[in-house]
């Protein structure tokens, strides 16, 4: 390569023009790019501080004896499967080029892969320690799985044996609805699809608020494979999505010996996808057996408790005194109180009857019939007077117009124009007076009619017919006088019963004894004797026993 560069330079003894720095830099750039093209470098990443604000990444690749600058452009950095990390030994694939600003050469990296299994394990441990320091793997964050989820969400490949094993195991143990979110479980886009699926399930509405029900449990599953095949489940975005999931999550990645970072962040790790299905739902037959056993034990316990309560009740019943001896004194006290209560009720009824009689007499003197009749007569007389006044006024206007016409005829030649204007004005005034008169008549009639309607409504509300309309009846004797008490009715006399829609005649029968209403305020408090009387040996009458019970 040095000989090739020397051949491009002019001999010192010639008169060839000199090269500029830019020309020399461009020549070196072309020589390096044409000579090496795409290369694969193995080295350790150093001086890496994360992507620049522009999105590009700058670092160095070094070994024991040398180092080279490296750059990853933004578009390439976004699609890298393995991101650069400080101290990670990698194999970088890219093109050798120069940077004219520093007169140095560098590699433009197109792809990065860990340099062997040891590098991947070192990256795995470093990432695990970083995420653990943030508390993503703490046991306090993990939630208990639902005992019997209504809907189970599965995130895996739709074509592999994993989904078939999960569906078969769930159907065999306890059939539950399963929502599958198909994703790639290997490759460059696997991590992004798995994290998007976890976030998508968490974004679904709760049960009953949309066409898709939000799962009660998530299963992230994949079959076995090498560390490189399972690396997508070690990506930081997948681990953070699993830790942030509000739905309990089971991770079933690979076989029992395979561990990924999502296993640490999940609420439960299953050794295999089949084991995840077994953790998700119980065995229906075992539940039925346990339920039947609990039912038998509950029935036996209830029977034993009932028998024990029956024995206790029998023992307590034998210790109780006889009911007749306990109720003898209260029954006698009740008989005496009932007799006093009947007397007090009759006395209160008489007092209320006197009060109602006085109120009825006052109401009959203030009945609105007379005032309504007087108001009607006044209204009728006012209407007749108003009509006569209108006729007289119209007649006077006609006479005035007649005189005006005669005068207009006599003085037609001198002032016909003036008289026409005067006649026109009088007609307008007459029309105005007539209109005002009619309005006054209409207003007065409306006011009188409204007052008459109010008085009629008052008459109806104060009349006893409103009481009859509510289901009561007015009882009159043969002379037409109202009867207020049953004791005033003579047996076998003809009575007139007035209802709201008419009258009926009836013949009075015998007086029937009924329970008088209880007066809440007796006029006299019963006097309690100091010594209780002896129980009477005489049995109460049949009618009294019926009234009491």
From Swiss-Prot:
CDD domains in UniProt: ExoVII_LU_OBF
Gene Ontology molecular function, alphabetical: exodeoxyribonuclease VII activity; nucleic acid binding
Enzyme Commission designation: 3.1.11.6
A Gene Ontology biological process term: DNA catabolic process
Catalyzed reactions per annotation: Exonucleolytic cleavage in either 5'- to 3'- or 3'- to 5'-direction to yield nucleoside 5'-phosphates
InterPro entries: Exonuc_VII_L (IPR003753), Exonuc_VII_lsu_C (IPR020579), OB-fold_nuc-bd_dom (IPR025824)
Signal sequence bounds: none
UniProt keyword list: Cytoplasm, Exonuclease, Hydrolase, Nuclease
Major subcellular site: cytoplasm
Enzyme class: hydrolase
Stated family: Belongs to the XseA family.
Assembly and binders: Heterooligomer composed of large and small subunits.
Name of the protein this chain belongs to: Exodeoxyribonuclease 7 large subunit
Provenance organism: Beijerinckia indica subsp. indica (strain ATCC 9039 / DSM 1715 / NCIMB 8712)
């Amino acid at each position: 390569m040095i000989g090739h560069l020397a051949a491009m330079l002019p001999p010192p003894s010639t008169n060839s023009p000199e090269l500029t720095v830019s020309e020399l830099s461009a020549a070196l750039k072309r020589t390096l790019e044409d000579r090496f093209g795409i290369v694969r470098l193995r080295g350790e990443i150093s001086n890496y501080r994360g992507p620049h604000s522009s999105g590009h990444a700058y670092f160095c690749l070094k070994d024991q004896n040398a180092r080279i600058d490296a750059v990853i452009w933004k578009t390439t950095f976004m699609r890298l499967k393995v991101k650069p990390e400080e101290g990670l030994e990698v194999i970088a694939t890219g093109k050798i080029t120069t940077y004219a600003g520093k007169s140095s050469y560098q590699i433009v990296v197109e792809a990065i892969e860990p340099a062997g299994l040891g590098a991947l394990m070192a990256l795995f441990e470093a990432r695990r320690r970083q995420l653990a320091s943030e508390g993503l793997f703490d046991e306090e964050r993990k939630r208990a799985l639902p005992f019997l989820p209504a809907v189970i969400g599965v995130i895996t490949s739709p074509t592999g044996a994993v989904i078939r094993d999960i569906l078969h195991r769930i159907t065999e143990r306890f059939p539950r609805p399963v929502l599958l979110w198909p994703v790639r479980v290997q490759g460059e886009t696997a991590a992004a699809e798995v994290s998007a699926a976890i976030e998508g399930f968490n974004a679904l509405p709760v049960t009953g608020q949309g066409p898709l029900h939000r799962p009660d449990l998530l299963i992230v599953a994949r079959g076995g494979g090498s560390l490189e095949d399972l690396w997508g489940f070690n990506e930081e975005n997948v681990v953070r999505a699993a830790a942030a999931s509000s739905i309990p999550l089971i991770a079933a990645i690979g076989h029992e010996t395979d561990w990924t970072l999502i296993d640490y962040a999940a609420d439960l790790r299953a050794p295999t996808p089949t084991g995840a299905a077994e953790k998700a739902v119980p065995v229906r037959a075992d539940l039925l057996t346990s339920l039947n056993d609990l039912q038998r034990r509950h029935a036996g316990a209830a029977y034993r408790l009932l028998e024990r309560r029956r024995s206790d009740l029998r023992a307590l019943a034998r210790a109780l005194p006889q009911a007749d001896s306990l109720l003898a004194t209260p029954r006698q006290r009740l008989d005496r109180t009932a007799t006093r209560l009947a007397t007090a009720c009759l006395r209160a009824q008489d007092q209320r009857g006197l009060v109602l009689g006085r109120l009825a007499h006052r109401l009959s003197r203030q009945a609105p019939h007379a005032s309504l009749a007087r108001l009607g007569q006044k209204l009728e007389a006012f209407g007749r007077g108003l009509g006569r006044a209108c006729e007289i006024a119209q007649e006077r206007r006609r006479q005035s117009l007649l005189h005006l016409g005669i005068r207009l005829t006599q003085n037609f030649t001198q002032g016909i124009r003036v008289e026409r204007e005067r006649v026109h004005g009088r007609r307008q005034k007459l029309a105005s007076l007539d209109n005002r008169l009619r309005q006054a008549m209409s207003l007065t009639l409306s006011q009188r009619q409204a007052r008459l309607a109010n008085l009629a409504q008052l008459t109806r509300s104060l009349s006893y017919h409103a009481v009859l309309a509510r289901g009561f009846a007015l009882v009159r004797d043969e002379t037409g006088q109202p009867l207020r008490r049953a004791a005033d009715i003579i047996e076998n006399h003809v009575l007139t019963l007035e209802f709201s829609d008419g009258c009926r005649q009836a013949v009075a029968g015998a007086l029937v004894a009924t329970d008088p209403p209880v007066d809440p305020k007796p006029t006299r408090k019963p006097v309690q004797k100091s010594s209780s009387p002896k129980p009477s040996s005489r049995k109460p009458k049949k009618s009294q026993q019926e009234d009491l019970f």
